Amino acid sequence: VATGGSIPKVSHLKEHDELLWQVLDDGLQGPFEIVNVDAHSDLAMFTGQLDIGNFISKMVDLGLVDRTLWVKDKGSMDFMDGFYNFAIGRTGEGLRLGSSLSVPFYFLNEDYAPRNALITSRELALTVVTDLSKPVFSDAKWILSIDYDYFGCRNPQAKDLEEMIKMIGAETISTLYTKGSTIRTLVEWQEFRNDIDRMAPGVFTAICRCLLPSFTYSTEEIMGKVVELSSFIHKSRDINNCLGIYLIDSVGSGFTDSAKHAEIDKCVKAWIDRLRYP
């Protein structure tokens, strides 16, 4: 079992949902913080089946995680930068979890549930940051999770998005995304969705399904991102409190470009060696 003060173990996983099983196999005891370097937040609610987008909520439900620092790319979506405190718990629909955070990300998949509707409840403190020039301090026990799609992300639904752009135009999609991002109540969200469906039936669901982050970087830019991330982590967290480091390929799921994987892997592992043995 890894404990504060020891050299953290490094686990290399194919997909992000494997992290939960690896943490349990490592015998880590919660609660701890997960520092998630990722193109996606991975904070969707557990529906009864574990997947690459909802494993963190299940870790919260199990009492393993009580804090999340999401380090995101400027092209990422899901949440705006800032601090969020909310509850995650059972909704009464089987093993399904709900979130008390009133934001579009949770309205979209019907994951939102007010606190008084949750049968069980665990608190999560979420910090979202894009600009890594200023450290975000914490003395909590933590694990570091690095998804390689942070250094270059593909959209598996890119072809569908292209068709949608041809149909209604990129400007319309951008306007709808900007407007939707500002909504903070479920009633407003439902009205927003109904207005779009009246304008063009089925368009709302289609846009939401294919509107995913997509960005690419040159080798020099990837190295620059690693250097920037290295500085941020060194200033923000104590490596002696790190319980484990998890590297995620995300090639099979289609989010990390297989052509870029080798150089991303090389850059990240070179930094991780320096992080573990300063």
Q: Where in the sequence are the language-model features?
A:
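Conserved alpha-helical scaffold segments that buttress catalytic/binding sites
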Residues: 1-278
